[in-house]
Structures are given as C-alpha cells and as structure tokens.
Amino acid sequence: MEFQYSSTEIRSLEQIRIYQQGTLVKSVRLAKTDHAYLDAARFYGSDNKEIYSYGFEYNGKRPEGYMSIDYWGYCNGPSTSSPHALYVPNFTLPNNRTIPGLNRSLNEAYMQKGILTKIVYPTKGYTTFTYEPHRGQNGVLYGGLRIKEMNVYNESGNLQEKKWYKYGLNESGNGRAIRTVDPNDYCSQSYLLEAYWAPGFEGAITLLGERTRVDAYHAFPLSDYFQQGSTVVYSCVTEYMGTPAAPEGKTEYRFSDFMDEWYYGTMRGNRTEIPKWSNAWKCGKLVGKTVTDNSGKIVYSLSNTYEEINRRDYLNLRVLSYCNIYGPASGIKEIFSTHTDFSTATEGSLYDYYNYYITSGEYVVKESKEFNDGVYKTVRYKYNELGQIIEETLVNSEGNEQIVRKKYTCDFWKDAMSGSIYDKMYWKNIHSPALEISVYKGEALVGKTTNEYKDWGDFIALQNVKQLNYYEPRIKYQSYDKYGNPTVISKDGEFEEVSYIWGHQGQRVIAEIRGGSFDTLGPVLTDRVTSAVSPSSADMAIIEALRSNPSLEGSRITTYYYDSALNLKQLVMPNGTKTSYEYDSFGRLACVKDQNGKIIESYQYNYKQ
C-alpha cells in the first residue's frame, strides 16, 4: 500500500494506492475541505476509472483561527481575536481580584459545528444523524455529543428505517459524569522561599526571606475529564426502531459501570489528579440486552455476569513540587531540614505526595443466560492465568449439561522436557492454539480432539489432528513449504493423499493432486514455482504434462491460474475441463465462463453514478 499526502505543512492524507506484486489494482482518493473535512472517498479500479464513492456532509464548519473552547476542549463560540488569548477560565483570587480568562462554558450549538450529519452510500441511499449533548447527574450538560437519532433513506429519498435513542436508567436521559468541573482542577499551588546570606558572629548565616505563594492556572484540567473517550457514561441505552408514531419495538442495552476511587486529598490536603483506583477497565461491558416487540413482549434477552481474573494492584507514589528555595543561598535546599526556619516553612518537605494504584487483570464473562424464541440456555466459563477459556459448560432448557474443556501450551509446558515441542511453543509465545479439546455429556467423555504440533525448522505448525474412537491421526500434515503452507495432507477414512504446489511466493495454490505426488517434478522446479512472483508458462506446462504421466495413472490433478491481482483466472479440472473467471476493473467477479466461452454465471453491482 502506498500513502500519498498533501505538500502543505498539514500533510493531509490524499490518496491510498494498493498494489499486488507491483501492479496497481485499486486506489482511494480523498476529497477534503481545508484538509479538515472529508467530503468524499472515491474508489478507482486498475484502469483509473471511478467505480463508486461515499459522500459526507457536516453541520457547517468550526470557526477558523484560534477557536474558543469549553472546559472539555469543544468549540463554544466564535474564534478568539488573538493567538495570545488567555485560555484559562475566569478565576477569583482570595483577595476577590478576578483573572479575566476565556469563557469556558458549554455551548450546544457551537459544540455541534463541523459534526458529521450525513453519509451518502454508493447506492445513493444515505443516512442522516442528529446529536444532543451529554447529560450527567441531575440533567447537567457536559461536553461532547451523543447520537439522538439516525434516519436511513433510499436513493429516492424515501425513509426506510428510523432509529432513536434514550439514555440512562428508566430513559431519564442522565448518565454519570466522569468528573464535575472544579476550578481547583485548573490550578496548581506551590510556594517560593527566599534564602539569603547575612553576617553573623562566626561568619555568614542563612536566613529565611520572603515566602511567596504561586498559583499556576492551566488551560486544561490537571485531572482527566474523560473515560473511554466520553465525559459521561451510561449504564443503560435504549434503541427504538420504526417511527415515533408506530414503533416496531425496542432494544435495551445495559452496561457495567464502576466509579473510580479517590483520595480525599494529598498529604497537604490538595485535590489529587489521579484516582486511587481506576475502574475504567471494568466499565462498558455488556451486562444485559432485552429485545421487545411493539406490544411490549420480550422476544430475546441476554444476561451476563462478570468476574475479575488475574488481578494485580501495583502501588505507586505521585510526587508534586510544593516548594522551591531560591536566592543567593538557594543551595540550602540540599540540607534545608537542618535549618529550623526552612523546615517549618516547608512543613518538613519540598514536595507533596499521594499514593495511587495501577491495576492489571481482566473482567470476563463468568455466566451468560440467554432467552430466544422460548428457549433458554446458560453458559458458564472458567479461565486460566492467561485469560483463556479452559472450561465452557452449556446447560439447555431441559437442564442437560455439555462441558467442553480445553488445554493450551501452558498446561503441557509445566511438565514438559526442555527442548520438547511444548517447551519451544511456550518460549516462542505460541499460547493461543487449543492443544486438547474434550467434550463431556455430564461427566461422560463423548469426544476428544488432540492437535499435535511439530517444529518444521523455520516455524512450528500443526502436524496431526487426532480424535477419540480411533485416537489415531484423523488429519495428518506431512510437510510444509518454506512459507508455512501445507504441501501434503492425508485424512482418516480416505485412501489417498492430497498434495499441493503453491505459487506466487506462497500466496496461492497453483496445483493439486489426489492419489499421487509431485515428486517426479523434483525439488528444484517445485521451489522455483513456489518462490516465483508468477509461475512461468514453461513450468506450468511441465505441471500440466503430469496429467498424461503413466506413473500417475488414476491420480487426479487440478491446476489454478491467476491474474496479476491474484484473482483466480482459470481452473482446469482433472478431466481437462476449463472454467474461466473475469473481473471488473475493481477486481470484483463479473462473470464465469465454461470452456466454450459461454457465460454460466454473471454478477452485477448496484452502484449509481
């Protein structure tokens, strides 16, 4: 893929070009306004002709220049007149003097400036969006927008579907604000202590001079006003469909929500910037889903119970500058605690402190209960220390249990010998494959699958798949090429092996033989075909000649030919029958022809110009 940017300082992305083996197969051109608003995404084929496009419309534009912003950074008014405008909010000092800062209050109309309002699809149908501001406790407005309504229209402008959303418990419209606006969040306090030399009886002595309080005001809050990108979170969202006059029903979504835990203050009683414990990692999980029809009847419900696994809490110390010693004798700060005046003035330390925790772990589904079309089922899960499912218990409406137990690399590595395949997989971080899957009805074992891996030299890959009853290989991977593609596979119950030759640098199968092998070709030709960007006509002719090789009588050979974009161009069956595939300039299948050139399948795509 090739990315092309504008030559301006903004370096805005203008075009994406996609190549396959050096040949351009498609491109995307981005039409923008002022490099800030994407007006259209136009898709072109290999012939440089436009195939289809998406269009985007917005609610006007945000003010140009130095934008006025609210407490959360959203636009709240016309541009400021100067780049030197004071972005801190208005503040009143203890002596009732006011610092004339920027108006940081929320403005719903300006906050929606420049927001996406319409998407036009290649079919010329379109979707429109309506927004509203977030609402926290007691209906207080907060920065940021939430979707209020979505309308879907066809190409003729006829309304096809309408969705609208209600937020909060009992559709109150209110959620939980991450943090209320507090002037202290925009101000940090510290002190300056003057230290100077004065003559004494036995030489110069260090004296404490002026003690100055410094209030530093900031354009943005020192604390985070967002969680997962939002200033307000909602534990319940209800989606309606149809029209307000004739709703088709609704879907209620319920999500996990946990407040962060905060200290009351720092060691010196100041407001902390970081929560003692952040619970954001447990928030936003789907707790429940209920679908009702327009009569209020429940047609589907889902209820999830979660648990913490592998939790670790790491204690940290936040250190803030509280006092700085300056002046001719500022070196005193190295040993200030030995000077009573300075120690008293700094209350024993030049810094302020508080603790907080960083938590690791996962919040996973422990039990899921589902009701669908009158049928109930419950699924319970157990996990290992890597968060992988090791046991899944399904209980149906009749109370019957099916248990699936899984074992992974870490389960076998614990008892494995050094240098064994499990030891190699563990240290290469190959942890995701399930190596053993056992199925029980109640406590009776009814099925078992074992996946055996092998170190093939350059990589580790599957060798055998064994199943209960036979407990012999059901699928055996006998060899791979250098790209990790299987070249010989045998299956239990089938008396013939299947061999493959891969081409186009290991990206596509170019030949398949059943009941025989490609050994007569020799490793030199096979490796040359596999490694080539595109197999030569001469090499493909040698492979095709195997069809008449007496030593391969009874075997069945299928060959595959591809175009420069690696789309299947021709399929030659074991009996020699050829099927051809043709594509449009954007690489989509247009038609399928038999060996006589007759179209047997045709495809058309409904995009309006």
Name each region found by the language model.
Residues 524-538:
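Surface-exposed loop/turn segments flanking beta-strands in extracellular/periplasmic regions
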